[in-house]
Amino acid sequence: MSLDRLRPFRRGVVLATTSLAVAMVLAAPPDRARAQARAAAPAGAPAESAAALAARLQARYDAIKDFTADFSQTYEGGVLRRKTTESGTLLVKKPGRMRWEYKTPEEKLFVADGRKLYAWVPADRQVTVSALPSGDAPATPILFLLGRGQLTRDFTPSLPGAIAGAPPDSVAVALVPKTPVPEYDRLTLVVDRASLGLRMLIATDGQGGTSTFVFTHLRENVGLPDAKFAFTIPRGADVVAQD
């Protein structure tokens, strides 16, 4: 199978996993609150259940209005059988607006304006347009950006134990969708044990591929204007509409 034929698959994986990554990052408290939360955690407290941890993550996400960050993403294994690393910036505004701008090594842009989702790859001169999922859709990551998804309702959480590369004083929660979806099989979140600050997000797909995300320079509730999430189809670009 040629690399060109694999591109649509890889971009679909990117879109699905990055969308839920946003939701999980929004669930983490800001950096300035982490030290306070860690100090307030009682020593010797009993281990928290996976369901309780997922519920706290959801509650934190529900309180966030908008969000900006830099990100890096590493994908390895799967159909491509090789390792790739990409980076860029993201903007998120609820309900249902996001802007993922990949800068290296290849420019790509994913924009959701609240109704439509646009995927633009300048090298291909192609824009893919699709509708955002409805509230009765399966547990797609984008539903969390729309304010319709619920971790404990849509996923079965569990505590997977030690995760390779996880920092000290962290805890992991694995999320398996109750309704199977094609984009991924499982998501694993590694968060600070006391503050829920996100450290790692690992998404595993059905082809054996793994995406690992790292977010830096997080800023919450900055008052992002809707204009940041408008997309104009470039002149001369091919447009592919997806149901």
PLM regions: where:
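Amphipathic hydrophobic-ligand
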Residues: 82-88, 209
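Extracytoplasmic/secreted envelope proteins and their assembly/folding machinery
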Residues: 51-54, 58, 114, 142, ...
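N-terminal leader/targeting segments and the immediate start of mature chains
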Residues: 31-83, 233-236, 240-243
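Gly/Pro-enriched, hydrophobic low-complexity segments
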Residues: 35, 128, 150-243
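Short beta-strands and strand-coil junctions in structured, solvent-facing domains, enriched
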Residues: 77-79, 97-99, 106-109, 125-127, ...
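Bacterial N-terminal signal peptides that target proteins for export
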Residues: 2-19, 29-30
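An acidic-aromatic
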Residues: 89-140, 211-212, 217
